[in-house]
């Protein structure tokens, strides 16, 4: 996934991957992580997700990383949140009371920024990468997360040959094969969400499974 591709999607507002509501799996399963209210939570490739507002409402300190500047700016403007902007290395840092967003490349995000996180949430990051780059991202996520940190991973799976991503199809087998070295993996739920995704229906995708996993960094 080239940076230019992602920037173009946001510039043209072709952001079908953006959810207008908080993810139901997040609402249902977040409490199973049993994290304290003041825990720091890392959200990779966060976009302008409302899920970050949900996490902040639980009392958490949210640390997000997003490549596209427009996505970050829209998060604060859409939610009417005041923010302060500063440069931090090669990343731009946007800060409000409980949410800090770092705009830039996740592969160059300093490990020091996530050194104190105890939780993480990946709904749109892993599935944003084509298979050729996905394992590299998974290793970078593991590098950024402290040992013992826990989080939720949400994936989509469908016949990839029917529709090109993003979001890309990530199977349970891929998750187990590529993440088990760095994470303990506990599948929590899986459901067919085809009816809720008109783009996939229009392209005659026969099924679309959304799954949620509880991960713990080894």
Swiss-Prot record:
Q: What is this protein called?
A: Thiopurine S-methyltransferase
Source organism, top-level taxon: Bacteria
Name of the encoding gene: tpm
Catalytic reactions on record? S-adenosyl-L-methionine + a thiopurine = S-adenosyl-L-homocysteine + a thiopurine S-methylether
Q: Does the keyword Transcription regulation apply?
A: no
Q: Where does S-adenosyl-L-methionine bind?
A: 10, 45, 66, 123
Keywords in alphabetical order, please: Cytoplasm, Methyltransferase, S-adenosyl-L-methionine, Transferase
| Molecular function in Gene Ontology | thiopurine S-methyltransferase activity
Q: Which organism is it from?
A: Shewanella oneidensis (strain ATCC 700550 / JCM 31522 / CIP 106686 / LMG 19005 / NCIMB 14063 / MR-1)
* SUPFAM superfamilies in the cross-refs: S-adenosyl-L-methionine-dependent methyltransferases (SSF53335)
Q: What family is it from?
A: Belongs to the class I-like SAM-binding methyltransferase superfamily. TPMT family.
Biological process, per Gene Ontology: methylation; response to metal ion
């Amino acid at each position: 996934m080239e940076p230019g591709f992602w920037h173009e999607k946001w510039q043209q507002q072709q952001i079908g991957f953006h959810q207008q509501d908080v993810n139901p799996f997040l609402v249902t399963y977040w409490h199973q992580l049993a994290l304290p209210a003041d825990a720091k939570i890392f959200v990779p490739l966060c976009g302008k997700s409302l899920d970050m507002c949900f996490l902040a409402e639980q009392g958490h300190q949210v640390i997000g990383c997003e490549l596209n500047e427009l996505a970050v700016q829209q998060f604060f403007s859409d939610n009417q949140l005041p923010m302060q902007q500063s440069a931090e290395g090669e990343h731009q840092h946007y800060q409000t009371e409980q949410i800090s967003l770092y705009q830039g490349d996740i592969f160059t995000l300093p490990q020091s920024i996530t050194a104190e996180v105890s939780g993480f949430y990946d709904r749109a990051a892993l599935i944003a990468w084509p298979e050729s780059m996905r394992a590299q991202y998974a290793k970078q996520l593991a590098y950024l997360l402290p040992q013992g940190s826990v989080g939720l991973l949400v994936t989509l799976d469908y016949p990839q040959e029917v529709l090109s991503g993003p979001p890309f199809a990530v199977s349970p087998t891929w998750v187990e094969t590529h993440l088990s070295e760095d994470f303990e993996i506990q599948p929590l739920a899986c459901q067919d969400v085809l009816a809720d995704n008109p783009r996939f229906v229009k392209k005659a995708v026969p099924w679309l499974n959304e799954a949620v996993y509880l991960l713990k960094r080894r």
